[in-house]
């Protein structure tokens, strides 16, 4: 099962790996991206992959995905998506053995709290450039996107002032235009989940900052699309985050220099 981020690259990469290892493939794309998946399979067939070796199975995870992963004829699963779903898959196939007594392998790429730690020696301008690119490109819909920015207390205010200013210059709209910095999130459900998280942080008293450049052409698109403006949320501690927020939301945690050793282990345990 591939993800809705980079829906052609990840999808065909998983297929190619399985084919190279001598397997036939039942390819289920994310339910949001069936058309690009169909095009990818058509290209593979045109390139010479035998028709019986790869089958495209679009549909919802709860139906098509569940049927695939519970079928004993499926001898291996590759998955890109949430940690919760990967854990469920692991439980479903953990006790399944083939006729030779071998377990069913699961290869899963899931979420996490990607962090950047900035100390007082960092060049602020470079930090802001890198943060904007990592946190907000592709509307934050990347496994590698920055989720938590850890700022040493001595440089936090200056860095945040510059970062807020840069966010206010970003254009949000149709990603087909070269002038656009931030496009929509994948669907209405994703938008609702992100907005629910932002509202929950506001309710806890956390400082929330949202800004994009005002533009009448962009604003018309905002009303009809699943747009979430780039968002900055200041937290009291890293431990407030329990799961990855998959969108253009950056969390900020301040730290003192003598706390650095303890901070370094937080992202790895998330």
What are these regions (language model features)?
Residues 1-5, 261-270:
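Short, compositionally biased segments
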Residues 1-51, 125, 257:
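Conserved small-residue-rich beta-alpha loop and adjacent elements
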Residues 6, 32-35, 62-63, 83-84, ...:
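Short alpha-helical
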Residues 16-19, 36, 68, 98, ...:
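Hydrophobic/aromatic ligand-binding patch that stacks against planar heteroaromatic rings
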Residues 46-49, 70-71, 76, 83-238, ...:
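ALDH superfamily catalytic-core signature
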Residues 55-78:
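A structured beta-alpha segment of the ubiquitous adenosine-cofactor-binding alpha/beta core
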Residues 248:
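Glycine-rich nucleotide-phosphate-binding loops and adjacent flexible coil segments
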């Amino acid at each position: 099962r591939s993800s809705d981020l980079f829906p052609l690259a990840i999808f065909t990469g998983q297929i190619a790996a399985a084919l190279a290892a001598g397997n036939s493939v039942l390819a289920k794309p994310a339910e949001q991206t069936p058309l690009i998946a169909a095009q990818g399979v058509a290209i593979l067939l045109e390139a010479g992959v035998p028709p019986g070796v790869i089958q495209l199975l679009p549909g919802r995870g709860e139906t098509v995905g569940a049927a695939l992963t519970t079928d004993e004829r499926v001898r291996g699963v590759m998955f890109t998506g949430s940690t919760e779903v990967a854990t469920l898959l692991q439980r479903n196939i953990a006790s399944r053995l083939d006729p030779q007594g071998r377990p069913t392998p699961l290869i899963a790429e899931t979420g996490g709290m990607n962090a950047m730690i900035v100390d007082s020696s960092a060049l602020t301008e470079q930090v802001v450039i890198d943060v904007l690119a990592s946190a907000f490109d592709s509307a934050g819909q990347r496994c590698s996107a920055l989720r938590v920015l850890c700022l040493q207390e001595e440089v936090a205010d200056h860095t945040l002032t510059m970062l807020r200013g840069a966010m206010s210059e970003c254009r949000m709209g149709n990603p087909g235009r070269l002038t656009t910095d931030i496009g929509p999130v994948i669907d209405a459900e994703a938008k609702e989940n992100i907005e629910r998280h932002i509202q929950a942080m506001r309710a806890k008293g956390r400082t929330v900052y949202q800004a994009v450049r005002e533009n009448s052409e962009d604003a018309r698109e905002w009303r009809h699309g699943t747009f979430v403006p780039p968002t900055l949320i200041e937290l009291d501690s890293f431990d407030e985050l329990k799961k990855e927020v998959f969108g253009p939301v950056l969390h900020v945690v301040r730290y003192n220099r003598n706390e650095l050793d303890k901070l370094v282990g937080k992202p790895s345990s998330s």
